[in-house]
Amino acid sequence: GQQVYNAAGDLIWVGGKQEGQEYGVAYAYRMIDIVRSEADLQNFAWYVDTTPSSGTIYGPGVWATLTADEQAKGQLLQPGDAIFYDVNGDNTIDQYDQVKMGNTVPRWVGGVNLSVDWKGLSLYARFDFATGYVAQNSRKQYYMALSQGTFNTLKESKDTWSEERPNAKYPILMYADTKFRNNYRMSNIFYDDSSYLCAREIALSYSLPERWARVVRMKNLTVSVTGQNLFYWTGSSLYNPEYGVNGNGGYAIPRTVLFGIKATF
């Protein structure tokens, strides 16, 4: 956690680990729907979202009950806005409506090696895996919220809400959240099951028969090719499922191919 001083000048701890909580657990909001049209607004008439920094978002039913001063401090729910899961059913979304996404620490890790030799031909393969964990794709959140300035965005932006795409998967796209709707807050749409199986190393070598080696005046000659970090089987949207908790600051593990010749004279 962090040590901070409250208004009374007392030193307190904020954040950090919670006693009795599972280590590595991740919590976030759960997006359950999108306002598809003006008519659809009535389905969320009593919806209230207190999390946007520019003011609470109100469904049209609640909005109609507010005074002019209260409306000036808030926002009216609009088509394209995300709808988040209300955990306790009080029609108000706040920090207590975050739900468990999973654990960022793999529950199971392991690997397997395979080695086969046949008539001078050798095959070696090494696979490893991690399963039972989730990872936060914070880069996806950053780009989907259009916080990257003039840089390009993701292909998912083609599946964001608009009047022409009312059934899109993602909320309305808005440059740098200029209307402070907070539709792209950290939620389930930015968490993936990052379980993976990796072909960590595959090596193939061939030792020429001695009679062939003698043709080129050698006692033994072995040629080989080795590939490392070749590919992943995974459902993760991260560049690499081994990034860790949120994918920030990570760089993909390089895929390498090595060729070798071993000669004995």
Per-region residue spans from a language model:
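C-terminal beta-signal and terminal closure region of outer-membrane beta-barrel proteins
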Residues: A8-L41, T160-N167, Y184, L230-F265
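Extracytoplasmic gating/loop element in the C-terminal half of outer-membrane beta-barrel translocons
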Residues: V48-T50, S54-T56, A64, A68-E70, ...
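Outer-envelope beta-barrel architecture signal
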Residues: W108-G110, K119-L121, S195, R217-L221, ...
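Membrane-embedded beta-strand positions in outer-membrane beta-barrel channels/transporters
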Residues: G111-N113, E201-S205, L258-G260
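Transmembrane beta-strands of outer-membrane beta-barrel pores
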Residues: W118-G120, F129-Y133, E201, L208, ...
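Repeated loop/turn-to-beta-strand initiation elements of outer-membrane beta-barrel proteins
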Residues: G120-Y124, R211-W212
